[in-house]
Regions:
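Conserved phosphate- and dinucleotide-binding cores of soluble alpha/beta proteins
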Residues: 1-114
């Protein structure tokens, strides 16, 4: 599964998500760190309670651990918080990323700077 980065509320940054400003603001206010299959979660792995969850047709990522093998894919500086959230939520069995991103995820987890 792909691990999406956190939505941002920034006029200078175009969102990777096709959502209106109200939805982006709701996700930012809910402290969304990233998403898997349209399910947004915090850096601690908790699902974000937003109105968006009622408007997306997708697998419920809480069901992912029941599958034999769930492999997450993500890399780069912008994905560090989202990868850590996915790992904290126990949504993945394995992760494919680059060394630099893996080191930053471990550093963030070790520093308890959640």
């Amino acid at each position: 599964v792909g691990i999406g980065e956190a939505p941002v509320r920034d006029a200078d940054h175009l969102s990777d998500y096709p959502f209106d400003t109200t939805t982006i603001n709701e996700l930012v206010d809910a402290e969304a760190a990233g998403d898997i299959c349209g399910n947004f979660f915090t850096i601690t792995g908790e699902l974000c309670d937003t109105t968006l969850k009622n408007r997306i047709i997708s697998i419920d990522i809480r069901d992912l651990p029941e599958h034999k093998r769930v492999i997450g894919v993500g890399g780069g500086e912008k994905k560090v918080r989202s990868i850590l959230g996915a790992l904290n939520g126990h949504y993945l069995h394995a992760l494919i990323t680059d060394v630099q991103t893996a080191e930053k995820v471990l550093e963030l987890a070790d520093n308890n700077t959640l």
